Amino acid sequence: MLNRVKLEIKDPMDWNTMYQESEIYSGIHNMNNGLPSNSFLPTDVSTVPTSMPYMSNGLSGPVTSIQGNLGSLGSMTQGMVGSLAPPASTPAYPMGYCQGESEFQRDPRTYRRNYSHAKPPYSYISLITMAIQQAPNKMMTLNEIYQWIIDLFPYYRQNQQRWQNSIRHSLSFNDCFVKVPRSPEKPGKGSYWTLHPESGNMFENGCYLRRQKRFKCERSKSGEREKKVNKPGDENGGSLKETPVGYDDCSSSRSPQAPVNDGGRDSTGSSIHQASGGSPVGLSPTSEQAGTASQLMYPLGLSNDGYLGLVGEDVHLKHDPFSGRHPFSITQLMSSEQDQTYPSKLEMCPTTDHLVHYSNYSSDYHNMASKNGLDMQTSSSTDNGYYANMYSRPILSSL
């Protein structure tokens, strides 16, 4: 027996040869590490000190029994831990609880907006009026109105561009809002907006849900009346603009006489100007000279009344009053020529009498004949008399 004890003391691992593998329990050091570190089981229980001098053979039985009980306890704890562990195929949280927010997705159809995020039942004019009336100075800039609406109604924190455009249109196209420019004392960007002094009764008893009536400024009404009044004036102005056209119509009725007058001037040269008042009005020729001139210049049988009418039109032409006083002026040269040409024209009258009987012929032939007669008349005058009278001042021009 002592030899056996000594053998145990020398080599404690020889116990394995005495028991089968099925009868040997694993020590507590082989237990699962999943147990907490502060477990009630000691880690060095398997190493039982056997080198005590008082140990006898009777103590070996209790030691082995204790070690066997501890081994069975370790196997029980390992089995319990294995049964509590979830299977590898199933997820740890099958219901989806306690997961991260990134993995959780809420169905948008089941989501209902809170009452605070719902659209307010106020119009844009009501919102602007509320913002301005709650301001300390009863005026706000456009950005201040935007900020006031966003702070009070969370619904307008989304789609800001849409409703901000509507706010601007409401401010511009309603007479109840007045734009006030900034004063030099308060520099900044943007003008102020305030309520019209006469627009206090737009809402019933301060209820902004519905307007009582649409406010219109009296000034705008008067402007519309002025526009309506100015419309008939524009029509009258159009009729006044059409009056020159009527004047052209009247002048066109006289157009048949215009070629006759122009033809008379072209065919006679400067003699019409002499007879019709090329000189001042006081130097007009006598009626007899006018009659003889009419026979010479108009052999087609024009009446004296028609000719005098044409002459009367030329009398009213504007002439230079100082043109007759200069010795080399055209009027004096033509007046000096007039004194010499008229006697020769009287002498030429018998030669042109035969042209009167052929009044049915074309006017071109008679105008050509009368023009040739005048050319012969001017060529027959001597140059000595012409130059002698050119430098002398006529008696009539001095009047």
Swiss-Prot record:
InterPro entries: Fork-head_N, Fork_head_dom, Forkhead_box_C, FOX_domain-containing, TF_fork_head_CS_1, TF_fork_head_CS_2, WH-like_DNA-bd_sf, WH_DNA-bd_sf. It is found in: Nucleus. Keywords: Developmental protein, Differentiation, DNA-binding, Neurogenesis, Nucleus, Repressor, Transcription, Transcription regulation. GO terms for biological process: cell differentiation; negative regulation of DNA-templated transcription; nervous system development. It comes from Xenopus tropicalis. Residues 219-290 are annotated as: Disordered. The lineage of its organism: Eukaryota, Metazoa, Chordata, Craniata, Vertebrata. PANTHER family: FORKHEAD BOX PROTEIN, FORKHEAD BOX PROTEIN A4. This is Forkhead box protein A4.
